[in-house]
Amino acid sequence: MSSKEAPMRAWLKMAGLAMSNKSWLSLGDFAGICAKTPLPMCFVVQTSSLPGGSVGATHYDRTHMNIGMVPRCYSRTVDIANTAIFQLGNAFVNILALCVILIISYNIRFKYTAIGRSEYGYFFQLCFMLICMTLVVDCGVSPPGTLAYPYLAALQIGLAGACSWALAVMGFLGFRLWEDGTRKSMLIVRGVSMVGFLLGSLVSAITFTNWIQHHPDMKTNTTALFVVMYGLNGLALLMYSVCQLVVSIFVLSNFWMTGSTILGVIFITTGQVLMYTISYEICEGVKHYLDGLFIGSICNVFALMMIYKTWDISTDEDLEFSVSISVDGDIMYNSNLKL
């Protein structure tokens, strides 16, 4: 090796080591996310590596204020009837989502003999509660800086975990590992969703409480919160998607179900990617009337619709059966009913 090549190799080695260290240090750091996307939890965490372009790093000293990281651009507040409403566009989408969930729940109740009817009804009840809590923390019912805000944000994260973990368990219903609709089945779904709720809410509450007590230090350890929000919940959604694809292709051979599952994955993935990557560009482009949360919420609504449609398709024909009562009072089942 020549004398000219030695410094170049050493420089490349040092650069690679620095990049590796940077990637390890960025694990669990919400600085890059919160600089672009106004997530509710961003207002109750802090980091020592705020990007220089963020509002919080350049425009004011946050050590004397009871808020965490502020994004560079976020949806403007609207004053209606002497009431400040945050995230107005996102609020309209979430209200629409509540209406969609009510319609879906109504349809689920009338599919009396469908497989997973009770489990999916419970899942959409969790989704309804999650969206209600999202309206509370997003729209300023309890604005950032109040004492209740960190705990409400923790409840929102916990409900998101409950929905994700319940969905993961429901993905196994198509394999008939246990009888659906029974006390055992509901105990499994509710128990797993409760674990997801407790894990998400407790980790969030502990993280936010640590910030409340030490926020003048300008840093919060958010690694556990990052792992729970994006690691475990993402793994649960992946498990559901894989199970539905396996059931639709190899068990039912129903490619309409496969298509609806793939559409749901596309919607949720697209919404998350756009929300975390181009929220700032969206906000600047529409003069602060909307931001990435609006796009993410719309995609989440379509993903919920695809979850219902996937279940609806899977229970449309061969998995339906009729129930009747004979003259002697016996309950008769007919599994050959075609709808």
UniProtKB/Swiss-Prot annotation:
Its main location: endoplasmic reticulum. The keyword Membrane applies. Keywords: Cell wall biogenesis/degradation, Endoplasmic reticulum, Membrane, Protein transport, Transmembrane, Transmembrane helix, Transport. The chain crosses the membrane at residues 84-104, 121-141, 155-175, 192-212, 223-243, 249-269, 288-308. Pfam families: Chs7 (PF12271). One of its GO terms (biological process) is chitin biosynthetic process. InterPro entries: Chs7. GO terms for molecular function: unfolded protein binding. One of its GO terms (cellular component) is cellular bud neck. It is found in: Endoplasmic reticulum membrane. It is a multi-pass membrane protein. The keyword Disulfide bond does not apply. Belongs to the CHS7 family. Chaperone required for the export of the chitin synthase CHS3 from the endoplasmic reticulum. Interacts with CHS3. This is Chitin synthase export chaperone. The lineage of its organism: Eukaryota, Fungi, Dikarya, Ascomycota, Saccharomycotina.
